[in-house]
Amino acid sequence: MIPTVIETSGRGDRAFDIYSRLLRERIVFLGQEVRDENANLVVAQLLFLEAEDPEKDIYLYINSPGGSVSAGLGIFDTMNQIRPDVCTICIGLAASMGAFLLSAGAKGKRMSLPNSRIMIHQPLGGAQGQATDIEIQAKEILYLKALLNQHLANHTGKSLEEITADTERDFFMSAEESKEYGLIDQVINRRPSASDPI
C-alpha cells in the first residue's frame, strides 16, 4: 500500500502518491532490491528531473540490499550521463549494488544517515549447463568484478588492489567507517535543502 498525500491549493484538493510528491522535491527513492523494473523507474525519474531543470541537484535515497549488476549499471550510467548532480543518501542499508550506487553520487554530495550500514563485496553469480556455458558465465562474472572494482577504486580513491582484497568477502561498514573509506563524503543528521546547501 502506497500512502497518499492531499494538497490543498486555490484550485482545490489534489491527491498524490507519496513517491510522486517526493519527485516534485527532486527526491528519487530506491528502497528495494535493484531489479530491471525498479531500475527502469529510477532511470526514468532521473531523466524526467533533468528535463525539468538540468542545473538543480537530484537526491537519490538508497535503502537497498543490492541486486542485479546490469540493472544497477543502467542507473549508474544514467547518473553520470545526466547534467544535474545526483546526491546520494543512504538510509538503513546500502549493500552490494546499493553501496556501489551510493558511492557513485556527485563528489562531495555522497551521504549517509548515522545509523546506516554499508556493505561492499564481489558480484554474486551462478551457472549451470554444459562446461562451455559455465566457462562463458565465469568469464562474464570476472569481467563484472573487475569493472565494479575499478569504479569503486575511482569513487573511493583506494587502490584497485585494496578494493579487490576488501570485496573478496562481505565488508560491512558503519556510516563513519564508510566516510573514512571514501564511499561517502558526509554523515548527516538533516536532509540538505536549497536553503541549507551541502
Curated annotation (Swiss-Prot):
It holds the Pfam family CLP_protease. The active site is at residues 96, 121. Its EC number is 3.4.21.92. InterPro entries: ClpP, ClpP/crotonase-like_dom_sf, ClpP/TepA, ClpP_His_AS, ClpP_Ser_AS. It comes from the Bacteria. Keywords: Cytoplasm, Hydrolase, Protease, Serine protease. GO terms for cellular component: cytoplasm; endopeptidase Clp complex. It is an enzyme of class 3 (hydrolase). GO terms for molecular function: ATP-dependent peptidase activity; ATPase binding; serine-type endopeptidase activity. It catalyses: Hydrolysis of proteins to small peptides in the presence of ATP and magnesium. alpha-casein is the usual test substrate. In the absence of ATP, only oligopeptides shorter than five residues are hydrolyzed (such as succinyl-Leu-Tyr-|-NHMec, and Leu-Tyr-Leu-|-Tyr-Trp, in which cleavage of the -Tyr-|-Leu- and -Tyr-|-Trp bonds also occurs). NCBIfam families: clpP, PRK00277.1, PRK12553.1. Belongs to the peptidase S14 family. Fourteen ClpP subunits assemble into 2 heptameric rings which stack back to back to give a disk-like structure with a central cavity, resembling the structure of eukaryotic proteasomes. This is ATP-dependent Clp protease proteolytic subunit 1. The gene is clpP1.
